């Protein structure tokens, strides 16, 4: 596979008169976890649908595993797996039956299907629930089964569209460990998420899009440092943040920011200083707030 698992140049897509993606340039190195952040309606799902061959682009170049999406779509499909926002499993069947059925549909023999099913059940911590109907599974178990199904045939690139939406903290962190293990196996993971902590914890590279355009790309550390060295917060008596400002961290800059922040405020309000977070990055880049993961 190419050193770049995914590359887009000037990617554009519109529906009717609405421009959804407007000149997206991305480079996803092979073997990395790459996170796409953006508010609702930013174009995340449309982009992942194009990259996974579900939609055609209107303009631009898209290469997946070195293959041009416009001319080598069949080869692209043989290089990717996709797990969407909603679990695509048969709730009447057991977890084992779901996996074995997909193995057979993928062309594996009965013996190969049995072996691959057992392997995936172990890897995704579903062996104990293998013979239980999926309708009895928790949300986290369903998501793990859904990802396992997408990996029945081993492919170098996995697309995950908001994989932990709706999961509780324990299930979400369990899935994070599985995603990190997939990276260790050499799989490139391209995920979209609404959760800033998820991108911060998992991603080697993060791209932020807003209104169909890339507004920033970098590591979590570089994105945080790009907005300043320290963040000043002013809190009221109820411990609510009433004002905030990112600063370079120098005494001169912090004094100036404090003077501006504290104008016309009660002297009883408290000041705190912290390092920038992904929340600060996102708000600075998009003027919107992302959804916080449930705790």
Model-derived features with residue positions:
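Conserved ABC transporter NBD signature motif
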Residues: 60-71, 75-76
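Conserved ABC ATPase "signature" region
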Residues: 81, 100, 104, 111-129
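Catalytic Walker B motif of ABC-type/P-loop ATPase nucleotide-binding domains
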Residues: 158-162
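ABC ATPase "signature
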Residues: 217-218
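Short, charged/small-residue-rich alpha-helical element at the C-terminal edge
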Residues: 222-295
């Amino acid at each position: 596979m190419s050193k770049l698992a995914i590359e887009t140049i000037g990617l554009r897509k519109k529906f009717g008169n609405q421009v959804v993606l407007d000149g997206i340039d991305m480079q996803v190195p092979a073997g990395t976890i790459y996170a796409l952040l953006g508010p609702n309606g930013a174009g995340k799902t449309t982009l992942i649908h194009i990259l996974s061959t579900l939609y055609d682009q209107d303009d631009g170049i898209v290469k997946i595993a070195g293959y041009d999406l416009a001319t080598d779509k069949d080869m692209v499909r043989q290089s990717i797996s996709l797990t969407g926002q909603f679990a695509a499993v048969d709730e009447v069947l057991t977890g084992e039956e779901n996996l074995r059925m997909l193995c057979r549909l993928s062309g594996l023999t009965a013996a190969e299907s049995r072996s691959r099913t057992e392997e995936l059940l172990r890897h995704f911590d579903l062996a104990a629930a293998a013979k239980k109907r999926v309708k009895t599974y928790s949300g986290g178990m369903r998501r793990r089964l859904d990802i396992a199904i997408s990996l029945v045939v081993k492919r170098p690139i996995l697309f995950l569209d908001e994989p932990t939406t709706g999961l509780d903290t324990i299930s979400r962190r369990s899935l994070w460990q599985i995603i990190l293990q997939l990276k260790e196996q050499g799989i490139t993971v391209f995920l979209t998420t609404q959760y800033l902590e998820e991108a911060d914890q998992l991603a080697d590279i993060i791209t932020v899009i807003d209104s169909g355009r890339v507004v920033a790309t970098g590591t979590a550390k570089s994105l945080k440092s790009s907005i300043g060295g320290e963040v000043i917060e002013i809190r009221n008596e109820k411990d609510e943040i009433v004002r905030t400002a990112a600063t370079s961290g120098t005494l001169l800059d912090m004094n100036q920011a404090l003077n501006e922040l504290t104008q016309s405020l009660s002297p009883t309000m408290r000041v705190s200083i912290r390092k920038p977070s992904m929340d600060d990055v996102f708000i600075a880049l998009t003027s919107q707030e992302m959804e916080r993961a449930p705790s």
